[in-house]
Amino acid sequence: MLRFDGLAASRAAVADMMDSLRHRGPDSDGLHVDGPAGLGHLRLKIIDLSPAAAQPMTNEDGSLWITFNGEIYNYRSLRATLMGAGHPFRSASDTEAILHLYEEVGDRVVEELDGMFAFALWDRRRERMLLARDRVGKKPLYYHKDDRRLLFGSEPKALLRHPGLAPEVDDRGVAAYFTYGYAPAPRSLYRDVEVVPPGHVVSYSVDGNEERRRYWDLRFPDAADVGRPDERSAEARVRALLTEAVKKRLVADVPLGAFLSGGVDSSIVVGLMSQLTSEPVRTFSIGFAGDPAFDETRYARMVSE
């Protein structure tokens, strides 16, 4: 939350918004209010299970606060670089790497992150709230802005818990959902609730001024510049990319598993996981009893065994 009217953020309002999202973070919770800014976090522990990694998290002097959802796959290399530049770390979390990286490069922090993420970062010195979302929008981030306040959260229900926002359906958002299977950003299913688009940062100052920037877009090179690789080279390239993608996602301080449908995609992922780890891979599957046309559990069982 960020107030534009000179009033302090309401701790009770932030806490009420958090209560609607407790299913997302069962391990711990935290809340911080700093004048017009209020941040809440419900944590699902993945990296650094200690209290040192609790959120909202701040830097050394309390001038920056962040609530972050996701995983940063290159946080170890970022951490090493930042420590070499003199930044002290109090945790082993990827969250803290974002804070110190922001101290170094400001808004360009998102361009250095390899991962899936959505975060809100309060910069007290600049009196500004920064909302950011990963390149393809794997992690959600909804927000509402009016003349008095900015509200944001991982699900619309958090925003709708605030008494200043009425739950009204957006007809265009619903029409888009039934047309495409989702409501394209920045539209949502609710009126006056928007989505931070993938690959974007949106910031608001305490006077309500908005700045919006696209930091990444999917660009396809011309076919003439790429050429036509032979089948063996293409296969090797795809295998290398998939292996690296799976490998970077195996960094965790908790046991890992995979949803195994029995289809090609999940079977490849589980196969690569088994090659990259020494421990047996835990898999989970869902079947369709009595409907053999859609039931692939037999294939899932073959892969898991």
Features from the language model and the residues they span:
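Cysteine-centered catalytic environments shared across enzyme families
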Residues: 1-305
